[in-house]
């Protein structure tokens, strides 16, 4: 657990293997955080998020696992929290959202809202490709037909990729 691996190396690992990784926090969710380095992104859980903020750099170790097809490090222990810089969101088309972007910060511009169902908002772009914004905090302000830009972290639930936003400010 002492040698720090790149996140790409950890993601290429195998179930049950312990990895130590270091990356910048891009998403804080209930009991988990997503981090990203220059090579890739990964979800860490469960995590006590006290003292953790977006943009902070953390070093942690955990056990490689998948939950509903989301690759993550489980039973995570945070070793260090230090100042960092939030990475620039990668401009992405919905049709480009795949496993290679999982747990990374992206930006989707010019997406049309096609459905609002509780806190799940479906958006479409580029010839009909769709995805959902899960637990969308700004749902009451969004209506079908709106054109929006979303800055979010790519997540996965079973066969579906979804976008997770930190706050309403991530949608414009």
Model-assigned labels for residue ranges:
Residues 1-172:
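OB-fold single-stranded nucleic acid-binding module
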